[in-house]
Amino acid sequence: MPVHLNQIIDVKKMPLGSVTKICFCGDHDDLTRLQIQLYEALGERAHLCFSATDCLEVLPVGCNKGAALTVLTQHLGLSLRDCMAFGDAMNDREMLGSVGSGFIMGNAMPQLRAELPHLPVIGHCRNQAVSHYLTHWLDYPHLPYSPE
């Protein structure tokens, strides 16, 4: 059941135990201030991340794309080192950091680039950069890739 922001009076009383995800959508500066308040109120009881500049997510601790990919690879008998992932937002951070080949999109949030400076940046999503990269990788796996 959706809860509207004006119904949350005390962020310390957020119903974290029965919630799988809370999204706050709005102005990025407002959400950044809210993120600080939520960190102060919730501490390590929740995972906070931006999935877009205008969307702040509150998730259970340990609930992220990296953790999901870990479960999937274990189920399939694969290694994370053999996986490739592409991302553009802070909700991709754990996933990109856990795989053997992580790639940051050209349109990625600056915070993601700053937190994972060792990962290569490929082209913009609007130019189908993932498709271009994968085509290059499949056709010429040993040649370096140059976006766009």
Curated annotation (Swiss-Prot):
Entries under Gene3D superfamilies matching the protein: 3.30.1240.10, HAD superfamily/HAD-like (3.40.50.1000)
Q: Name one Pfam family in it.
A: Hydrolase_3
Which positions, given as ranges, span the membrane? none
Listed cofactors: Mg(2+)
- Stored PROSITE patterns: COF_2 (PS01229)
Keyword field: Hydrolase, Magnesium, Metal-binding
Q: Does this UniProt record's set of keywords contain Ubl conjugation?
A: no
Q: Which residues bind Mg(2+)?
A: 88
The catalytic activity of this protein is classed by the Enzyme Commission as: 3.6.1.-
Which GO-annotated molecular functions does the record name?
magnesium ion binding; phosphatase activity
Is Hydrolase among the key words of this record? Answer: yes
Q: Which domain of life is it from?
A: Bacteria
Per the similarity annotation, which family is this? Belongs to the HAD-like hydrolase superfamily. Cof family.
What does the function comment of this entry state?
A: Catalyzes the hydrolysis of 4-amino-2-methyl-5-hydroxymethylpyrimidine pyrophosphate (HMP-PP) to 4-amino-2-methyl-5-hydroxymethylpyrimidine phosphate (HMP-P).
Protein name in the entry: Putative HMP-PP phosphatase
Gene field: cof
